[in-house]
Design a protein with these regions (language model features):
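Structural/interface elements that position substrates and couple domains in central-metabolism enzymes
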Residues: 1-127
Length: 127
């Protein structure tokens, strides 16, 4: 499958899009994408995911009403990612003491997503 086919499948809701990291950037992305695509919103923080499922936006970026209305599938279960073909990694990249980015979360999220990639999958990094 090529990128054009994947885009068509996403639009037809035959393939799923996953947003990995549901903080200030990832949560509003997931909510907006879910207006047009089947979206898996993944975060390793189970308490945060439970709040999102209850319609409570702990980031203040998307809003409680948007969370209550969204079709986004919020989860902290890694195995849910096996159903995705398009991934957006949106995890923190804080600065180290020497003003270089700390890529620990990016590397961990990359390894997590890599376990669920299939031929033709697409990964986008949003930082």
């Amino acid at each position: 499958m090529n990128a054009i086919d994947l885009c068509s499948d996403l639009t037809a809701r035959k393939s799923k899009l996953a947003v990995v990291g549901l903080g200030y950037v990832g949560l509003p992305l997931a909510v907006q994408f879910a207006k047009h695509y089947d979206v898996i919103g993944f975060d390793t923080n189970e308490k945060k995911v439970a709040r999102y499922k209850a319609g409570v936006d702990v980031t203040g970026e998307a809003g409680d009403a948007a969370l209550k209305e969204t079709d986004c599938q919020f989860t902290a279960q890694e195995e849910a990612l096996k159903d995705a073909r398009f991934f957006v990694i949106a995890v923190p990249t804080p600065l180290n003491g020497d003003n270089t980015p700390d890529l620990t979360a990016v590397k961990e999220a990359t390894a997590l997503v890599a376990r669920h990639l299939s031929r033709g999958s697409i990964v986008v990094y949003e930082s």
